[in-house]
Every structure is written in C-alpha cells, then in structure tokens.
Amino acid sequence: MKTFTHLLCVLTLSIVLFACNNAHFLKEESYRNQVAQDFEQKKQALPHGDLFAIFGDSALSVYEREALMFLYAYMPIGDVTDYPGDYYLENVRLSKQTRDEMPWGKEIPDEVFRHFVLPIRVNNENLDDSRRVFYDELKDRVKGLPMKDAILEVNHWCHEKVVYRPSDARTSSPLASVKTAYGRCGEESTFTVAALRAVGIPARQVYTPRWAHTDDNHAWVEAWADGHWYFFGACEPEPVLNLGWFNSPASRGMLMHTKVFGRYNGPEEIMLETPNYTEINVTENYAPIAKALVTVRDRNGQPVIGARVEFKVYNYAEFYTVATKSVSYTHLRAHETC
C-alpha cells in the first residue's frame, strides 16, 4: 500500500511538472502565430553569428521559449546584438517568479503582463540587472499590501533613491540612476517603471511631447491595479494615486501617449505601429476627449486618400507636431483631443 501511494504521488508530481513545463506564455494561438512569424523575420534579418543561440537550449520550457520569442521578435536590433540570451532568460524567469510569488500576480491579465511587466526596456536606456536588485530590495516593503498601496510604496522607495535634476544626456539606466541619485523626469520615470515591474506591477512611461501652457514637455508613470490604470509623478510620492503637480496641465494637454513593447491590441487608440512597438493615445486618462474629423480634398472636391495630416501645438515659438494621421478610405481618422 505504501509503495502504491508512493508511486501515485510520483505520478501526480510528474503530471504537474509536465503541465508546468508545457504551459504557454502566449496562450492565444493567433497571437502566438503572429509572434512566431515576426520572430522568424527578425532571425532572417540577422543571419550571422549566434545571436539566437539561446533557443538551442533543450532545457527551455514552452513558457520560457515563447516569452523569449516575444522579446526577441520586437526588441531593437541593438538589444539582440548587445546582450546575451542568458540575460533575457534570467529576466523571463524573474518575471515569472515574481508573478507566482506576489499576491496580485494572478489578477493581472496575460496581455497586460506580457506588455507591461515582462519587457525590460522602458526608453533608450542601457539595460541592466535592476529587476533582480530591485526585487530583493522591494519585496518585503510591499509584502501584504493591496496593489494600489504597493504602487504608492514603490514610489516612496524611488523617491528615497532618486531626486530630480535636469540633464540632456541619453537616458540613464535604472541602476545608474540609483548610483547618481538623480535624474530628469524621463530618467525618474524609467527608473520607477523598472521598479514597479520588478515586483510584478504593470507599469508604463507616459509622455506629453509638448505642454499647451508652457515651453516644455514631461514624462511620468502609469501603473495598473485592479483593472485600471493610475497615474502619478515618478519619484514624487503622494498619499493617493491619480494625483501629481501636473493634473491641471495634463487636463489641457493636446496629447498624452506611451510606446508599448510589441504588437499590442489593447482598448486604447493606436497612433502608430512599428516593428518594435505600438504607440497608443492615453489622453482620456487625463481629460474629456472628442473626435476631430479632418477632411482633405483636392481642387475638384475629392478626398485625397493617403494625405498626411499633422496635429500641432504652439510651443518653443514653433508649431510642434504631436501626432500625424493619414486620410483613409473608410473614414478620416480622428485624433483624440480634449
């Protein structure tokens, strides 16, 4: 009887392990096929060297292989060539570990996790090992907190590490920002997004190309909790979410947008799709919006299909383009403004 029970336990464990090793990261078949196609195109574009050698590792689980395929399919070419496959595999495993360990991990939809937790890159910073470092520092600080309180706590931690200082150099990496202890808004928001993702909280950097009220721009953070996106100033802790010094300027802004890693099919308006990212319009998180229908006609009164339409705001003594659309057959696509 003991032998039978032991065999039954071993069999059950084997089944569980088999199921875990064969669980999909990309659960939707049509999306999985699209990612596989984009990945093959990336491989064909980079046929030399051993840039994709990590995929030859027979020990990779289905989950790990698909997560790596997603990252490689849409990462910039420089990220393929500059960092080894083991680096990306470690980050895949860390993100999964965090999702399994954090109480909110199971609440995050797969699509949200895929685009706003797994990706390492936020802006044009150098990539580093911040996910592991930040997780080790933050896991006990957010332990037992509801998700929204955890977001606030992470931002308090970020404020302890980095303060604002203007600069014009390339965006510093998250660990470099900790070392210098300062950064401009784009660096503070890159750092904060990395910290939130390190503890499994979906986050994205939001940017307004130009303000309507003053000659400047700004970047901050949105984090996902309980089915909604909330905004706040990076390294600028407040007692609640959706509160920052920029509430009023953002309510008058012409555009707030973010670049999402990979092919993204979320509810927001898609402004631009590239081989690496999807640019989306998040203005409605800050102000009432409406559709502006622009018609372009030739001298005969006929619609000019494909005509380029630029939406501009006056800033720095010039009309600055914040969004570009083109005339389509189905309808003249509108840009959402407040």
Name each model-derived stretch.
Residues 1-8:
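Bacterial N-terminal signal peptides that target proteins for export
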Residues 18-19:
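C-terminal motif of bacterial Sec signal peptides marking the signal peptidase cleavage site
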Residues 27-30, 37-180, 215-216:
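Secondary-structure boundary elements
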Residues 140-141, 145, 150-156, 165-175, ...:
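Hydrophobic/aromatic-rich core segments of domains that either
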Residues 266-293:
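Extracellular ectodomain segments of secreted/surface proteins
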Residues 290-298, 330:
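A short, amphipathic beta-strand motif
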Residues 307-323:
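Short amphipathic beta-strand segments in non-cytosolic proteins
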Residues 331-338:
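Single conserved hydrophobic/aromatic residue that forms the stacking wall/gate
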